[in-house]
């Protein structure tokens, strides 16, 4: 199994269990999330409740909770929304922090294509929810989530150069 960590913080953000599609010259990975129900478990032990007292279920008080699989699996933490000015400031800081961590061709491709990726993300800002890894470090790579028109499940966008592949 492959896990993708935030190159800046080491937080796990994604794994190969979630297929991705490359966008913007490979700068952005698009991943489909899914709402899943977690929690309540209905266990049938074969007992006959009508023969056991007043018929009320005295089982465990489980509460079912709906979560997004990617957010839950990688313990992503939601962040406040950003306006255009905040986003540009974040991208400038991100470029400054990430560029020295990339080597050779990866660094050149990053410098060449980050502007296109930024222009791709900018018009969608108002629709995004923002997430970072579990550590919630100030230098974390942001994961962007939004709903396509008519979709019931969120789509996640990752800045691919900030992901480090680790074999588990």
UniProtKB/Swiss-Prot annotation:
Residue ranges occupied by any TCTP domain in the UniProt entry: 1-168
Subcellular location per UniProt equals:
Cytoplasm
The source's domain of life comes to Eukaryota
Check the record and name the Pfam families matching this protein: TCTP (PF00838)
Q: Which UniProt keywords apply?
A: Calcium, Cytoplasm
> Which pairs of Cys residues are joined through disulfide bonds in the record?
none
Q: Which Gene3D superfamilies match?
A: Metal Binding Protein, Guanine Nucleotide Exchange Factor, Chain A
Any single GO molecular-function term of the entry would be: calcium ion binding
Q: Name one GO cellular component term.
A: cytoplasm
Predominant cellular place of this UniProt entry's protein = cytoplasm
Q: What does this protein do?
A: Involved in calcium binding and microtubule stabilization.
Return the similarity comment. Answer: Belongs to the TCTP family.
Protein's recorded name:
Translationally-controlled tumor protein homolog
From which organism does this entry originate? Cucurbita maxima
Q: What is the lineage of its organism?
A: Eukaryota, Viridiplantae, Streptophyta, Embryophyta, Tracheophyta
* Gene that encodes it: TCTP
């Amino acid at each position: 199994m492959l896990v993708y960590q935030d190159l800046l913080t080491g937080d796990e953000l994604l794994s190969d269990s979630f297929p991705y599609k490359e966008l913007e010259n490979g700068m952005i990975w698009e991943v489909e999330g899914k709402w899943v129900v977690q929690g309540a478990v209905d266990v049938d032990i074969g007992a006959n409740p009508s023969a056991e007292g007043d018929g009320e279920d005295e089982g465990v008080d489980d509460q079912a909770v709906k979560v997004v699989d990617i957010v839950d699996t990688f313990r992503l933490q939601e962040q406040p929304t950003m306006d255009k000015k905040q986003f540009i400031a974040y991208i400038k800081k991100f470029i400054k922090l990430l560029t020295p961590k990339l080597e050779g061709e990866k660094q050149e491709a990053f410098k060449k294509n980050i502007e296109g990726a930024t222009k791709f993300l900018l018009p969608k800002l108002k629709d995004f929810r923002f997430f970072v890894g579990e550590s919630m470090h100030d230098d974390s790579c942001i994961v962007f989530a939004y709903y396509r028109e008519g979709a019931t499940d969120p789509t996640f966008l990752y800045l691919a150069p900030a992901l480090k592949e680790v074999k588990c």
